């Protein structure tokens, strides 16, 4: 037994201290583990440099990798010396096997880096750079929109300590934003060939009612600060308030765009303003085939902003409704005011519909039409009553179709026989004493009707008893014989032959 203990002691002394430690899960006899120094603190810069390196590989030190292997408790050692030597050999074999198994297991968990994996990581880094570039582009759009609003300010207080060029990332803060310039921001990665260029600066534009502040974080040796705030807020005295020239803003914008292009960030303009002929960033108005800044799309006469209201075009220039109607709209001949909506054109003039009225009755003339006399408009009733012809039959005004006869004008329905009111079918009529008559009543008025048949007598006639008869219609009332020969007798205004009269009244 003492020999076994001595061999075990020699084994522990000869075993290298950097070999992996075998731990057991047995709670009865926990084995002491070797105390190692804590891992070094995490450094983001070191991690970033290791991450961006495409050719470096992580060194794998097998001696510093540890694993936990479940070790079952060994059986008790036989007191015999021969059995102790066998047990010692078994322990040595098991130790060597366990050491190789642990090493293989750890190496399988940490495979070596091949070039394909390194290439994939490089692509991920490029995508991150693109994302940062897109975020910088969004910030550029926000800054350019704020610069458009900045043009509308009349004056600002300006304090310049040293000249500097504006480059890098920008941010526009609206009222109510509480961002800090010291907070980390995502910016586009600078290529290696531009590392010697001046370090970009970031600045912040804060727009609020009565408060305009432009701050620049000093990264290089230059600093530009322009503010219009009280001295108690800004912490520095402003010598005097001066207006910012338009060229300063334009040059600042040009320098900003050139700096972004040098970093590989493309800036796209939305066109040139038709009024100022400068690039448009942010909101844009498209009208009349051109693009405009919203603050430059104004009325050509009164110079007020048109915005989303209606406008009119004249010779390629926009006008608001009020000025367009006052300048170019036709005017009413009565009230001499511009005609905005419906219009009546008559007698060489333009009129409001409610102002185009009859000269006599003052009623508006509608779709029924009007009549003109000496340059004045009249409704139909007043015109024909004053100046129109009168029907000879009904003494009413003749407005539409008429018949001219007997020296006058007649309504078609009024030109009929004066006695029986029968229309003249064939267009022929007879006139007696200035009146139109049919043939029957004409002969009746003249006494040329046959007393026997009551038809007009156009040929020979026989006069008897104060009446006229056709020769064949003068007959005896009793025997109906013709009385064209000889004499006849009369009784109660009826003719009789001699025989019938003697027989009846003799």
Swiss-Prot record:
- The organism's superkingdom is given as Eukaryota
Q: Name one GO biological process term.
A: Wnt signaling pathway
Keyword Hydrolase present in the record's keywords: the answer is no
A Pfam family in this protein?
Answer: LIM
Chain ranges of the LIM zinc-binding domain:
271-330, 331-388, 389-448, 449-506
Q: Which cellular compartments is it found in?
A: Cell junction, Focal adhesion; Nucleus matrix; Cytoplasm, Cytoskeleton
Name the family. Belongs to the paxillin family.
What's the protein called, per UniProt? Transforming growth factor beta-1-induced transcript 1 protein
Give the organism the record lists.
Xenopus laevis
Taxon lineage: Eukaryota, Metazoa, Chordata, Craniata, Vertebrata
């Amino acid at each position: 037994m003492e020999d076994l203990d001595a061999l075990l002691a020699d084994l522990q002394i000869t075993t290298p201290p950097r070999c992996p430690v075998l731990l057991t899960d047995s709670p009865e006899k926990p084995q002491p583990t070797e105390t190692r120094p804590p891992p070094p603190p995490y450094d983001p810069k070191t991690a970033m440099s290791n991450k961006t390196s495409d050719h470096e590989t992580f060194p794998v030190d097998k001696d510093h990798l540890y694993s936990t292997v479940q070790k079952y408790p060994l059986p008790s050692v036989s007191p015999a010396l021969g059995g102790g030597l066998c047990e010692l050999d078994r322990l040595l074999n098991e130790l060597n096997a366990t050491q190789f198994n642990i090493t293989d297991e750890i190496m399988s968990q940490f495979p070596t880096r091949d070039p394909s994996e390194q290439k994939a990581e490089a692509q991920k880094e490029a995508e991150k750079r693109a994302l940062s570039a897109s975020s910088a582009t969004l910030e550029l759009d926000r800054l350019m929109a704020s610069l458009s609003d900045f043009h509308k300010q009349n004056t600002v207080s300006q304090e310049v300590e040293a000249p500097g060029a504006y480059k890098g990332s920008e941010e526009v803060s609206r009222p109510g934003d509480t961002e800090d310039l010291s907070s980390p921001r995502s910016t586009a990665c600078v290529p290696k060939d531009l590392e010697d260029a001046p370090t970009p600066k970031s600045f912040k534009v804060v727009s609020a009612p009565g408060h305009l502040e432009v701050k620049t974080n000093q990264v290089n040796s230059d600093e530009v600060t322009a503010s219009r705030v009280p001295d108690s807020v800004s912490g520095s005295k402003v010598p005097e308030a001066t207006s910012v020239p338009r060229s300063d803003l334009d040059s600042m914008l040009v320098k900003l765009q050139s700096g972004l292009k040098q970093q590989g960030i493309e800036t796209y303009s939305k066109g040139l303003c038709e009024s100022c002929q400068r690039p448009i960033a942010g909101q844009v108005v498209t009208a009349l085939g051109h693009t405009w800044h919203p603050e430059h799309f104004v009325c050509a006469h009164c110079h007020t902003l048109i915005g989303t209201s209606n406008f009119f075009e004249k010779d390629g220039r926009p006008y608001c409704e009020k000025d367009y109607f006052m300048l170019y709209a036709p005017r009413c001949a009565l009230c001499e005011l511009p005609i905005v909506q419906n219009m009546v054109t008559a007698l060489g003039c333009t009129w409001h519909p409610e102002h185009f009225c009859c000269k006599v009755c003052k009623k508006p003339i509608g779709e029924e039409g009007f009549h003109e006399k000496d340059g004045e408009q009249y409704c139909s009733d007043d015109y024909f009553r004053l100046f129109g012809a009168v029907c000879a039959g009904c003494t009413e005004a003749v407005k539409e179709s008429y018949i001219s006869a007997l020296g006058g004008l007649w309504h078609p329905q009024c030109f009929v026989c004066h006695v029986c009111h029968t229309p003249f079918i064939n267009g022929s009529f007879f006139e007696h004493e200035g009146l139109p008559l049919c043939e029957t009543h004409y002969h009746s008025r003249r006494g040329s009707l046959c007393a026997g048949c009551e038809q007009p007598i156009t040929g020979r006639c026989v006069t008897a008893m104060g009446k006229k008869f056709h020769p064949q219609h003068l007959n005896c009332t009793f025997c109906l014989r013709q009385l064209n020969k000889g004499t006849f007798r009369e009784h109660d205004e009826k003719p009789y032959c001699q025989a019938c009269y003697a027989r009846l009244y003799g």
